C-alpha cells in the first residue's frame, strides 16, 4: 500500500451447486492463496456460497441456514487475515430473501450490500426468489450484532483514507444508473462486483467494454469476479470471466472457462489524483451512504503490474500506425490554420538532418498538401557551422529535395566568428556562449528570411527538449509556430519511422531511415574525425528515461520516489539503479530551473494528454523551488 499501490484479486473458486460445506472450503482455500500472494482485497462471485444456479432451492430453509452458517465460518476464517473479503451469499431478512455481498475483515462482518437491480428477463428470473434491496442503507441484527445493510455501503481503510471500497452485484452495473455511480460520488475509489454473468456469443466483449467503461466514467478501480465452472449447466454456462480495471484500462483478465484467481495492483493515489485534476468529477454534496472503517496494514509489495517503457508510444504496431497518422494530421491541421490565418506566402524551416527538423519538414509538407499550396513555397534552410557533419548536411539536402521544398543554404560560420569578435569571445572557448551564439544566429537567419518572404518560421523543438530546457533561449527555443511542441522525443522517432514506412518515394525512405540511425545532437561543437562529437543523450541522459519521468510526473503527479520505483522495475536489465536515479535527479532539477523557457513558448498544437503549453496544460511559475522534489529523491536508498 506504500505510494498508493494495493494488491487486489478476483477469485472464481470451484463450487458445487447447493453443496455449501464444499463451497465454504473452496472459498477459504482461495482466501488463503490470495493472502499468500499479498492480496489485500479479494472478491468472489455472486451467491458463490451456495452457487448462483440453485433456482427454487433458494426457497428451502435448510439451504439458507447452511449459507448463514457458512458466512459465519468464512468470517471467522478471515480473523488472522490482513485483507478485505467480499463474498456473495443469500440472506433472509424480515422474511424476505436478499441477494447480498458480505464484506469481511479480520473476523468481522463489516456490512451486507444488497443487490438493487434484479434481472427478470431472458434466462434470468431472480424476482422469483429474491427481493430487491432497500432504497437507502440501514442496519439489521445479524448473529446478535448490528450490521450495516443496504446499497452502496462504503468501506474505508483506517490506514489509507483514500482507499474507499463499495460493492455492487452483477446486473447493477448493467443498469442505466448503477449504484457504483453514487458510491463514487461519495468517495469510493474502488468498486467491486460479485457477479454471475453467463456466457453467450460475444458477451465477453460487451462485458469487458462495460467494466472498462465504468472504471473510466467513475475514475476508479473496478474488480469484477464472475461465476465459473461448477455452476449448473442445465441451461447456462458460466466462464469465470474475471476482470480488474482502473480508469479505463484493463489491468488483469482471466482466461475464460478456467476457474482461477487473477491479481494486479491498483494505484489509489493515481485515481485520487485524476479525480482532483478532473473538475467535472464532482463529489456528492449530500452524503447519505454510511462509511465503515476497517484496518489494513501498510506494507510495500512487489509490483506485478507492468508499466510501458515508452508510455507515449502505443505498444501495438497497428495502433501505433493509426496513432502516428492521427498525430501528423493534428500537427498539420494546426499549421494549416495558422498559415491561412496569417496569409503567409512561405513556411521557413531550419533543417539540420536531425529527427526534430525532419518531422517539422514532413508536417509542413503535409499542411501544404492540405491547403493545396505549392511545396516550393516551403523554404528549407540549412545553416552549416562549426559542428555540422557531412552526414547530417547531406540528409538535410536530400530530404528537402525529395519533399519538393526549396532548399537554401546559408553558411553562418563567418557571421558567428564576427559576432565572437564583436563581443570579445575566444572561439577556442567552447562554452555555452560558443554554442548558443550559433543557435541564435540560425534563428535570426530564419526570422529574417521569413520577413523577406512574408513567411512563417516553423519551430522544430520537441516536448522532451522543452521539459529539460535543452534549447537555447531565444534561439531554437523561438519560432512563429512550434509544430513539435507537444511531441516527446521517443514519439518523434516513431513518427519519422512511420513516414518512412508509408512513403512511396524510395529515395525519401532511404534518407529518413538514415536520419533515424543518426545520433541525437545539436551539432554545436566541432566534429571528431568527421563524426558527431556532441551527443545529447551523453550529456542530459537517455530520452527514453526522461520521457518516462515526464509522463508519470505530469500525467499523474507522481512523486520522484514513486517514479524511481516504477523506473527500476520497468528498466530492469537495461539501466542500473544508480543510472536511473542520476538522470531522474537531473530531470527534476532541470524541469524546475528551465521553466522560464517554457513560460514564453510560441503557439503550437496539443497532441496528447501531456503537454507543456503555458497557456493550457502546464501553468507553472518560472521561479518555483524544487527543494521538496529534491528532498524526496534524497530519501531513496540504492
Language model regions located:
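ATP/NTP-dependent adenylation/nucleotidyl-transfer catalytic domains that generate, transfer
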Residues: 7, 161-163, 220, 229-232, ...
